[in-house]
């Protein structure tokens, strides 16, 4: 059986992570229910809206299987809301998986409507970049 990276795909930017894995020819599977967790060898908890992501804990089966896999030691990446899910101390009191020994402040750099796109010039090259609010 081929092992794959599991990408939590309940909400958020899971498709962008899949595109990155495709670039390096890494097998992946989207985790949408607890059965999808069985055959993964690494895990990505993507960014998105952290309040929505935290709701995975309402589904104890997914929550417990994710915790078991992470506690077994599989490599795990959390970006933005995924980091919030992993942290053991969220300053605004939101519940998390409590795996990573860190303190996180949600929306520390502003709210959703504080995100913007802007032109940046570096080494005489100008490109459009997206600036998003993020946890700290």
Label each residue range with its predicted role.
Residues 1-59, 64-74, 121, 126:
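N-terminal beta1-alpha1 cap of cysteine-dependent amidohydrolase-like domains
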Residues 5, 110, 132:
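A residue-level signal for conserved active-site and pocket-lining positions in enzyme catalytic cores
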Residues 9, 101, 117, 133-134:
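Short, structured patches in soluble enzyme cores that scaffold and shape functional sites
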Residues 50-120:
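Cysteine-nucleophile active-site neighborhood
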Residues 120-136:
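Active-site oxyanion/phosphate-handling segment shared across diverse enzymes
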């Amino acid at each position: 059986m081929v092992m794959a990276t599991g990408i939590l795909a309940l909400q958020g930017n899971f498709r962008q992570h899949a595109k990155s894995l495709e670039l390096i020819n890494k097998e992946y599977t989207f985790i949408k229910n607890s059965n999808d967790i069985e055959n993964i060898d690494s895990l990505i908890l993507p960014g998105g809206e952290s309040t929505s992501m935290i709701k995975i804990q309402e589904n104890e089966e997914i929550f417990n299987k994710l915790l078991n896999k992470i506690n077994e030691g599989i490599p795990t990446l959390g970006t933005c809301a995924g980091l919030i899910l992993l942290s053991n101390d969220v300053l605004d009191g939101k519940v998390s998986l409590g795996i990573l020994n860190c303190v996180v402040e949600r929306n520390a750099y502003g709210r959703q409507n504080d995100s913007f796109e802007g032109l940046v010039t570096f080494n005489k090259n100008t490109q459009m970049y997206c600036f998003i609010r993020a946890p700290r």
